[in-house]
Amino acid sequence: HWPLLAPSPYHKMYNQSDVIGVVKDEVEKKNPHPVFSAFQQLEYSQNYTDEKKRRHVIPTYMGLISEIDHHIGRLISFLDTNNLSENTVIIFTSDHGDYLGDHWLGEKDLFHEPSIRIPLIIVDPNMPKNLRGSSERRMVESVDIVPTIVETMGGSYASNRMEGPSILLLA
């Protein structure tokens, strides 16, 4: 979210040459649905569709992601150092992605890939070795996380009381 401010050294890790192009087409602006048009007119969408602003801001966004990676590494090092890794399940996710100018939009508003495809990383020391480091392309939702935690911890839940299924079934 704006303002994108990254502390040192992350604010200088990337530069404008690291920014990839946007996914957008003039067709998306010609006769858009009124809702789509309204989101395109929002200030943050306008900021991301200004290529000069976009190329200035996205390296900071990338730096913030690197900062998160660094702190996840610190957490894992702490768990390893204190012999807690074998008894700790780590779940890392985000609430939404960001358009970063794709489809003439900024932030999260609608349901294109940049907005809905988010990281979901699960590190479970009890996971079978053949599944470690694997990637899953099937869609899961945030509501699937709580049932997954309950099942991972050996508990049970009434499926009519929780909206999502455990994603352990995907394994």
Locate the predicted segments by residue:
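Active-site-proximal cap/lid insertion segments
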Residues: 1-87, 91-139, 152-161
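Zinc-coordinating Cys/His ligand positions in small cysteine/histidine-rich zinc-finger domains
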Residues: 142, 146
